[in-house]
Amino acid sequence: MALRALAAEHTKQTGSEVTFISGSPGQIQQKVDAGEKFDLLIMPTPALAALDTAGKLAAGTRIALVRVGIGIAIRDGAAKPDITTPDALRKTLLAQQKITYSDSKTGGLSVINAQKVLQNLGITDEIKSKLLPHSDGQGLIAKGEADLGLYNVSEIPRAKGVVLLGPVPAAVQAYITYDAGVPASSGSPSAAMDFLKFIASPAAAPSWLAAGLELAEP
């Protein structure tokens, strides 16, 4: 994971250890509301913005950190159709028999963004009969039971038998952006800001890219 690798590098440089606590946005918000103390929060923009508005973050510390877009997943070894332009992607999708993406119970924001890409392409109605939401859609692709899928780029390399064909074109892309900020209750705000600056720096970009994410635009 990019963040853990960056934390290890930061520890080598500074001696400052980083401990991770993972959870869904709702779980993290509950912990914060219950008074649990953190030194840095990284959450999808709407979730962290809500905490910021509620006064839970130190003023001026919230930044857009990284973002992830939708990519096309295909079976490893399958023919590679053209998705390099919106028109090419539109034709490729309409030519398929079954197209999968995460179901609403497991996919969260990636489901919404997969649907946004289809809306941006203007093919929501045309393609409806081809869509196959599934909790293990990438498994269906690997078995040949679906032709391709729309997933967060960061999720695709993890699946066995499935490869990333590429991200969808920028003109129809939909991103999930993750913000970061220092809680007002942090016991080590200076160390937290140092780490935040490190993971948001250009030097961190290759690590994020290797994990399918990119530094967010300012």
Where are these regions (language model features)?
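Active-site acidic carboxylates
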Residues: 58
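Exported/periplasmic ABC-transporter solute-binding proteins
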Residues: 1-26, 30-34, 45-55, 63-68, ...
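Periplasmic-binding protein-like
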Residues: 39-42
